[in-house]
Structures are given as structure tokens and as C-alpha cells.
Amino acid sequence: MSTYAIIDLGGKQLRVEPGRFYDAHLFSSFKSLLSESNTKIIIFRVLMISHGTEVQFGYPWLKNASVKARILHKKQNDKMLIYKMRSKKKTRKKFGHRQKIARFIVDAIQYNGQTFTTNLK
């Protein structure tokens, strides 16, 4: 039985499962939470939950649904290079940037009082 949820986090939709690591772009509400490691967060923007054969959809979000997670640390993504060139003009520009991201682990998915966690034995 695979349990997963689709959440809306920072303008992106992520498919999350309990016990797995994910990277999310660092946005303003995350920046205040990163002062300490293992900061616990609760995400209420849950679009869909699947548990076994049951699937629940929200319009746009599910009521009484949340995803509990811990922010482990912040880091930077690999460098993205941008190269602009005008043909036949000898004009070239090369620059890049590194996007700041936060790594988090999903502890549990909750829906209507039920808690779905990992089934590690």
C-alpha cells in the first residue's frame, strides 16, 4: 500500500511520501524557520491524498488534511549557467546563479484524524 500526497509548496506541486527527503525552493515563509535544524512544519495546502485504493481530491485543497515535515537544512542548488550570444556580432555574455533550496523530510500525512507514516520494520 503506497501512501502519498500532492502538496502545493512555494508555487510548485510536489508528490510526497512519508519518510522521504525533498528539496523545495527557499521562499519567504521558509527563511524564518531555518534558524535551527530539525524545525518542524505543518503544510496545510494538500491537493490530493492517496492511501491504498482510496483517493481524495480537494477543490482546491483538502479540508482536515495536513503534511507534517521537518526542515533539515538549507543548501544551494547546482550552478545554472546562462549564455547569451548574438550571432555575427561578437557579443557574448556568460553568467550564472545558484538557487537557494531547503531540504525537508516528510514525517506523516494526516487526513480526518488518521495518521499515515512509514511502515519501517
From Swiss-Prot:
Q: What NCBIfam families has UniProt attached to this entry?
A: L21
Under the heading InterPro entries, the entry gives: bL21-like (IPR028909), bL21-like_sf (IPR036164), Ribosomal_bL21 (IPR001787)
> What's an example GO cellular component term for this entry?
ribonucleoprotein complex
Indicate what this protein is called per its UniProt record.
Large ribosomal subunit protein bL21c
Per UniProt, the keywords (alphabetical) are: Chloroplast, Plastid, Ribonucleoprotein, Ribosomal protein, RNA-binding, rRNA-binding
Matches recorded under SUPFAM superfamilies = L21p-like
UniProt GO molecular function: rRNA binding; structural constituent of ribosome
Q: What is the protein's known function?
A: This protein binds to 23S rRNA.
Q: How does it assemble?
A: Part of the 50S ribosomal subunit.
Member of which family? Answer: Belongs to the bacterial ribosomal protein bL21 family.
User: From what organism does this protein derive?
Assistant: Chaetosphaeridium globosum
Asked if the record carries the keyword Hydrolase, the reply is: no
Q: Does the keyword tRNA processing apply?
A: no
Q: Which Pfam families match?
A: Ribosomal_L21p (PF00829)
* Gene Ontology BP term (one): translation
